[in-house]
Amino acid sequence: MQYQEKITVFTPTYNRAYILENLYRSLQRQTCKEFEWLVVDDGSKDTTSQKLVEAFDMKAIRRPIHRKIPCQPEEFIYETAAEKVPLTLIRKKNGGKADALNMGINACRFPYFICMDADSVLQADSLIKITAPILSDENTIAVGGVIRPCNDVELENGWVKRYRLPKNPLACMQVIEYDRYFLASRILFDQFNGSLIISGAFGLFKKDVIITLNL
């Protein structure tokens, strides 16, 4: 696989009008530019779709989606190429997160896709790092990223301006537990090809394999 080959980053979302823009701003700061962002709105009852359309001057389009895996049908599709990162919004009938994930997989236009939660933000080199294993070995079918909770984190335009341990003891313990799990356990298990799970908050997958396995 060549470095120039693009990937799809997609986010299933439901009632996240207040937070999606932070994720988009962090995607704009990525040093890797060969990707598109796809948002699947799973029938939100708030203004999730409306805010995205207005914030990024999106236009309604017609685009056939071949549903190789089952999911609820789309209601409308919007797209913009005016921003640094191409953005597509698919609004669909509510079917739950798994159904929204299926729609995202069906709509991906590239061989690899990255799943990201709506409340995630990325470091500037995150996409470069998570795609490195598939660039070095085309047999790699899934890659997991390191996740840390954003407790007591200051964000500015989708960027972590200040990171510190929370003052709340329970929140602090959560940060320590995440670090222990991702920076110790998972890295250790990976040395023995023993990783059992890829986090849904930030994981990369090979599209044709996922469709074949019907996961």
Which residue ranges define each predicted feature?
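N-proximal low-complexity "stem/linker" segments adjacent to membrane-targeting elements
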Residues: 1-29
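Short, acidic, metal-binding catalytic loop of nucleotide-sugar glycosyltransferases
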Residues: 25-34, 54-60
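Short beta-strand/loop segment that forms part of the nucleotide-sugar
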Residues: 34-43, 65-69
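A conserved acidic beta->alpha catalytic loop
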Residues: 41-61
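The conserved acidic donor/metal-binding loop of glycosyltransferases
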Residues: 42, 101, 117-121
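Acidic donor-binding/catalytic loop of UDP-sugar-dependent glycosyltransferases
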Residues: 47, 120-133
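Long helical/loop segments within the catalytic core of UDP-sugar-dependent glycosyltransferases
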Residues: 65, 69-70, 77-84, 96-100, ...
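Short aromatic/hydrophobic "clamp" motif used to bind/position activated sugar donors
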Residues: 113
